[in-house]
Amino acid sequence: MSDEAKQAIEHFLHGQVECWNNGDKEGFFEHYRSMTRSGLSIEFVGRPLPTDSWEILEGMWAQQQPRCRIEVRETIINGEEAACYHYNAMRDGNGGIETIELYRFDGGRLWVRYFIKN
Protein backbone atom coordinates (compact mmCIF):
# COMPACT_ATOMS: atom_id res chain seq x y z
CA MET A 1 0.00 0.00 0.00
CA SER A 2 1.26 3.47 -0.82
CA ASP A 3 1.91 6.13 1.80
CA GLU A 4 -0.81 8.19 0.12
CA ALA A 5 -3.38 5.41 0.60
CA LYS A 6 -2.39 4.95 4.25
CA GLN A 7 -2.67 8.71 4.83
CA ALA A 8 -6.14 8.71 3.23
CA ILE A 9 -7.26 5.95 5.61
CA GLU A 10 -5.79 7.76 8.63
CA HIS A 11 -7.45 11.01 7.51
CA PHE A 12 -10.81 9.24 7.19
CA LEU A 13 -10.61 7.43 10.53
CA HIS A 14 -9.51 10.43 12.56
CA GLY A 15 -11.54 12.98 10.60
CA GLN A 16 -14.88 11.23 10.94
CA VAL A 17 -14.38 10.97 14.73
CA GLU A 18 -13.44 14.65 14.96
CA CYS A 19 -16.52 15.65 12.96
CA TRP A 20 -18.74 13.40 15.09
CA ASN A 21 -17.46 14.88 18.33
CA ASN A 22 -17.80 18.45 17.03
CA GLY A 23 -21.33 17.98 15.69
CA ASP A 24 -20.20 18.55 12.08
CA LYS A 25 -22.67 16.36 10.19
CA GLU A 26 -21.66 17.58 6.72
CA GLY A 27 -17.98 16.93 7.46
CA PHE A 28 -18.77 13.49 8.89
CA PHE A 29 -20.67 12.45 5.77
CA GLU A 30 -18.05 13.98 3.48
CA HIS A 31 -15.41 11.73 5.05
CA TYR A 32 -17.57 8.71 4.20
CA ARG A 33 -18.34 9.94 0.67
CA SER A 34 -14.63 10.46 0.02
CA MET A 35 -13.92 6.77 0.66
CA THR A 36 -16.99 5.19 -0.98
CA ARG A 37 -16.91 6.00 -4.71
CA SER A 38 -17.90 2.39 -5.43
CA GLY A 39 -20.15 1.72 -2.45
CA LEU A 40 -20.59 1.41 1.29
CA SER A 41 -21.55 -1.59 3.38
CA ILE A 42 -22.25 -1.36 7.12
CA GLU A 43 -22.90 -4.35 9.36
CA PHE A 44 -23.73 -4.46 13.05
CA VAL A 45 -22.36 -7.90 13.94
CA GLY A 46 -25.04 -10.10 15.51
CA ARG A 47 -27.92 -8.06 14.11
CA PRO A 48 -29.91 -8.41 10.87
CA LEU A 49 -28.09 -7.08 7.82
CA PRO A 50 -29.11 -3.51 6.97
CA THR A 51 -30.55 -2.60 3.61
CA ASP A 52 -29.23 0.93 3.08
CA SER A 53 -25.92 1.87 4.67
CA TRP A 54 -26.46 5.60 4.14
CA GLU A 55 -29.76 5.37 6.06
CA ILE A 56 -27.87 3.57 8.83
CA LEU A 57 -25.37 6.45 9.06
CA GLU A 58 -28.22 8.98 9.09
CA GLY A 59 -29.90 7.02 11.89
CA MET A 60 -26.67 6.76 13.88
CA TRP A 61 -26.17 10.50 13.57
CA ALA A 62 -29.75 11.37 14.58
CA GLN A 63 -29.98 8.92 17.47
CA GLN A 64 -26.46 8.68 18.87
CA GLN A 65 -24.45 11.78 17.99
CA PRO A 66 -26.33 14.04 20.42
CA ARG A 67 -25.91 11.43 23.17
CA CYS A 68 -22.30 10.27 22.91
CA ARG A 69 -18.78 11.41 22.21
CA ILE A 70 -16.18 9.06 20.73
CA GLU A 71 -12.97 8.46 22.66
CA VAL A 72 -10.41 6.64 20.50
CA ARG A 73 -8.65 4.00 22.57
CA GLU A 74 -6.71 2.32 19.74
CA THR A 75 -6.42 2.44 15.96
CA ILE A 76 -4.49 -0.17 13.99
CA ILE A 77 -4.03 0.06 10.23
CA ASN A 78 -2.68 -2.92 8.30
CA GLY A 79 -2.67 -2.57 4.54
CA GLU A 80 -6.15 -1.59 3.38
CA GLU A 81 -7.83 -2.61 6.63
CA ALA A 82 -8.19 -0.96 10.01
CA ALA A 83 -9.42 -1.90 13.46
CA CYS A 84 -10.53 0.74 15.94
CA TYR A 85 -11.34 0.37 19.61
CA HIS A 86 -13.63 3.18 20.72
CA TYR A 87 -15.34 4.16 23.92
CA ASN A 88 -18.57 5.98 23.16
CA ALA A 89 -18.87 8.14 26.27
CA MET A 90 -22.32 9.45 27.13
CA ARG A 91 -22.32 13.24 27.01
CA ASP A 92 -24.32 13.35 30.26
CA GLY A 93 -21.50 11.51 32.07
CA ASN A 94 -23.52 8.32 32.64
CA GLY A 95 -21.16 5.66 31.31
CA GLY A 96 -20.62 4.62 27.75
CA ILE A 97 -20.43 1.82 25.22
CA GLU A 98 -17.31 0.05 23.97
CA THR A 99 -17.05 -0.79 20.28
CA ILE A 100 -14.58 -2.47 18.00
CA GLU A 101 -14.93 -1.25 14.45
CA LEU A 102 -13.42 -3.01 11.45
CA TYR A 103 -12.90 -1.14 8.18
CA ARG A 104 -11.87 -2.55 4.80
CA PHE A 105 -11.02 -0.18 1.96
CA ASP A 106 -10.89 -1.73 -1.51
CA GLY A 107 -11.13 -0.01 -4.88
CA GLY A 108 -13.31 2.85 -3.70
CA ARG A 109 -15.58 0.59 -1.66
CA LEU A 110 -15.76 0.64 2.14
CA TRP A 111 -16.95 -2.20 4.34
CA VAL A 112 -17.58 -1.44 8.02
CA ARG A 113 -18.35 -3.98 10.76
CA TYR A 114 -19.35 -2.78 14.23
CA PHE A 115 -18.96 -4.99 17.28
CA ILE A 116 -20.86 -3.42 20.18
CA LYS A 117 -20.29 -4.54 23.76
CA ASN A 118 -23.61 -4.69 25.59
Q: Predicted segment positions?
A:
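Short, cysteine-centered beta-strand-loop-beta hairpins and adjacent loop/turn segments enriched
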Residues: Q65, M90-I97
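A solvent-exposed, acidic/Ser-Thr-rich amphipathic alpha-helical stretch
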Residues: K6, K25-G79
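Short, hydrophobic/aromatic-rich segments at coil-to-beta transitions
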Residues: G79-Y85
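Residue-level recognition of conserved beta-strand positions in structured domain cores
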Residues: F44, H86-Y87, Y114
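Short beta-strand edge/turn micro-motifs at domain boundaries
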Residues: G96-N118
